[in-house]
Amino acid sequence: MRMALGISYNGQAYCGWQSQPSVRTVQDALEAALGRFATHPVSTLCAGRTDAGVHGLMQVVHFDTPLDRPAASWVRGTNGFLPADIAVQWAQAVPDSFHARASALARRYAYVLLQSPVRPSVESGRVGWVCHRLDHDAMQQAADYLVGEHDFSAFRASTCQAPSPVKTLRRIGISCRGQSPPHPALGWSPCYWRFEFVANAFLHHMIRNIMGCLVAIGQGKQSPQWMQQLLRARSRAAAAPTFAPDGLYFLGPVYAAGWGLPERTVAFDGWP
């Protein structure tokens, strides 16, 4: 039978999702735990691979097993063998035609960025950081230029293995929350920015490369129209440096309601 799992993880201690020799990865930790609980080797396929240091709030995987066990048993049993920074949130039997990656209509990511004169401490590794104030309207205008189907070569890592740089970016939403009293030394208020990205798929480092450009625009180093120029140039060298992975979260994939998966993974009304 085929099982689907929803997984959350803190990516700080891992060299990304995908299994690699001689380094610690989320996939290896999950498959080791599943294998111990199932008492047979388990190979998983995920909805979206994350890089080193990137977190997952609702990664979805599927695997095949000859065992017929209750869903709750898979959750409790697998979690019993997982490290504290990885957890199975839900388990569900799915049709053999379900594929965690190929069945996904889209993927959702969020980048959480602390704007503060002082670097993060408690949140270190879980938020990005910028020590200058950002212009929301300029960043949102620039982000809107990216929405739609485009060649995203300017935001593609040199190691990217995707067959095509053309992707459909459905939305970039930018908001600022949690303003606190002004910093006593510098006189302005720290806040948390949230950048949410929705696309059919993403290139390697695509979001972090876009983030580097949005922050440069938000700081006034470039105009919003620079984003249009980058799209036309299709040159990675012309864009800003890759932003840190710390504040990047894979919110999860989006599936058709017909698969019967938990609500957080289901396409909203009117999708796409």
From Swiss-Prot:
Catalytic site positions: 51 (nucleophile)
This molecule's function is given as: Formation of pseudouridine at positions 38, 39 and 40 in the anticodon stem and loop of transfer RNAs.
Q: Give the protein name, as stated in the record.
A: tRNA pseudouridine synthase A
**What is its quaternary makeup?**
Homodimer.
Instruction: List keywords of the entry alphabetically.
Output: Isomerase, tRNA processing
EC number(s) recorded for this UniProt protein: 5.4.99.12
A molecular function GO annotation: tRNA pseudouridine(38-40) synthase activity
Does the entry feature the keyword Cytoplasm, yes or no?
no
Reactions catalysed according to its record: uridine(38/39/40) in tRNA = pseudouridine(38/39/40) in tRNA
- Pfam families of this UniProt entry? PseudoU_synth_1 (PF01416)
Picking any one GO biological process from the record gives:
tRNA pseudouridine synthesis
Q: Which family does it belong to?
A: Belongs to the tRNA pseudouridine synthase TruA family.
